[in-house]
Regions:
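Short beta-strand-to-loop acidic/aromatic patch adjacent to the donor-nucleotide binding site
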Residues: 143-155
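Active-site-proximal specificity loops/subdomain of glycosyltransferases
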Residues: 83-142
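Conserved catalytic core of nucleotide-sugar-dependent glycosyltransferases
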Residues: 157-239
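Terminal low-complexity segments of carbohydrate-biosynthetic enzymes
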Residues: 1-14, 85, 287-455
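Catalytic donor-sugar/metal-binding loop of nucleotide-sugar-dependent glycosyltransferases
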Residues: 249, 259-276
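Short beta-strand/loop segment that forms part of the nucleotide-sugar
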Residues: 68-80, 101-105
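N-proximal low-complexity "stem/linker" segments adjacent to membrane-targeting elements
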Residues: 1-62
Length: 455
């Protein structure tokens, strides 16, 4: 294995020996000075459906043997009160004693969301980002100094993986760590969004910016490319960093988090989760429905990346830019698909090259065009409006007086407002506005803990 470092802003920790299995005692000692809390965002279907329940139960069995976690917060979405009680029964059955159930549909946490919304912090959009954001508030209310996130659909989870994930932040004082792993299951390659969208898109952007010598754009692109698995949901934050961060509330949450880390952190690590393949629940392919599945995820990811370049570095988007980027993306994706086909043959894996090419052309290409249209359409709108005015003599005197220049200048000054990814504010900002909010959250947690203890 090549364990050389390729980016000075990112440390990569590889599994070079079995010595990593002995790090749990170090984590226990470190947790005495750094209160450590794990967040598990989950839908009710993770434990109520026959298909998902064994995966969730295995996660509970593994977590019951982890000794350095002060609390485990289960951020529960789309659940009834009865399903929240069912979760409490499961946690007790499998020996999870230090749990907190954060039922976002329950009256207690609804009241917290209402307080935040009434104060002007828009947290209306449902999803993983909103769920995690509230869990981070709960963790802070409980005094956490180190906060981890673990997805609830990992089919191959073992507690050793969690130990590795926490080690950089808890034991080595990094600000952030992120898991990477091999996505292989059922004798085939997975990780389609990473392999067929994120990597070729980032490489296409890098190719474009290298051609014109735009180094300021390359810094962010190179940073994102340095992560071996940008879309992994398994991360750990030092609380001092987490409090300053914003979080996306759409499918771009993982990429957006990396961009926020790029902006705000200096001591960052990625950790090899396991030497064995990693598997979790897969998104459905839905080219006919732009609001679901991989298509929606792809649009959100592309929008998040381009938005960061627009807001952070002042990238100007035009029809030509989007079209040229799409053509470059298709070329790069074709090159990578050839390499994946060769690698699959080398490793005797099943590989459907036609299906991968269809996904690139039928879903991801259209997602890039759709996201590009979102960014470029305001420019076309102004241009079309000016053409309409110039075709009518009644408006010529206004155009002669500089109306067109005023409109274009106004658009340029305000273009950053057109590219905002749906996101939360930082917890630092909330605490400035609502200094008692953590006390309110703590009161809800205590009340609901007493309830779940009796059921």
């Amino acid at each position: 294995m090549n364990f050389s470092k390729k980016n000075t802003k990112l440390t990569t920790l590889y599994l070079l020996s079995k010595g990593t299995e002995e790090i749990a005692p170090t984590l226990r000692l470190s947790s005495r000075r750094k209160k450590t809390i794990l967040v598990v965002p989950a839908l009710a279907t993770e434990f109520t459906t026959e298909e998902n329940r064994p995966v969730f139960v295995n996660i509970l069995k593994q977590l019951s043997k982890v000794t350095y976690l002060s609390k485990i917060i289960f951020g529960l979405d789309k659940a009834t009160d009865e399903e929240a009680v069912e979760l409490a029964h499961l946690l007790k059955k499998y020996g999870i004693k230090n749990y907190v159930i954060q039922n976002n549909e329950g009256e207690g946490f609804k009241s917290i969301f209402k307080t935040l919304n009434d104060a002007g912090f828009n947290l209306e959009q449902p999803g993983k980002g909103k769920n995690m954001f509230m869990s981070f508030g709960v963790a802070q209310a409980l005094g956490a100094k180190c906060i981890g996130v673990l997805d609830a659909d990992i089919k191959t989870f073992h507690r050793r993986q969690l130990n590795r994930l926490f080690y950089p932040v808890l034991a080595l004082d990094y600000e952030f760590s992120k898991a990477f792993y091999t996505r292989i299951g059922e004798h085939r390659m997975y990780g389609r969004v990473k392999r067929l969208l994120v990597d070729p898109l980032l490489l296409s952007l890098k190719r474009k910016f290298c051609d014109v010598g735009d180094d300021k754009f390359l810094r962010l692109i190179d940073y994102l490319l340095a992560f071996n698995y940008q879309l992994s949901g398994e991360v750990v934050f030092d609380t001092s960093l987490l409090k300053r961060m914003h979080f996306a509330t759409n499918w771009g949450v993982e990429i957006f988090t990396l961009i926020e880390v790029y902006r705000r952190a200096n001591n960052v690590a990625q950790v090899q989760f396991d030497t064995k393949p990693f598997d979790h629940k897969h998104q459905v392919i839905s080219p006919e429905d732009k609001g679901k599945g991989l298509y929606k995820m792809a649009i959100d990811i592309v929008t998040t990346i381009i938005s960061a370049l627009v807001v952070e570095e002042g990238l100007e988007i035009s029809d030509y830019f989007v079209q040229d980027l799409t053509v470059t993306y298709l070329n790069v994706a074709d090159e990578l698909i050839k390499k994946y086909a060769d690698n699959a043959a080398f490793s005797a894996l099943d590989y459907d090259r036609n299906a991968e090419e269809e996904m690139v052309r039928g879903i991801f290409k259209d997602a890039i065009l759709a996201a590009g249209d979102y960014f470029a359409s305001p420019y076309r709108l102004t241009e079309r409006f000016l053409r309409l005015l110039s075709s009518d003599g009644r408006f010529h005197k206004y155009l002669d007086q500089g109306l067109d220049k005023d409109l274009l200048e106004y658009e340029k000054k305000n273009q950053s407002q057109l590219f905002e990814v749906p996101q939360t504010v930082s917890w630092d900002r909330i605490l400035m506005r609502l200094p008692k909010i953590l006390h309110d959250i703590s009161a809800v947690v205590k009340k609901e803990a007493a309830f779940y203890a009796q059921v």
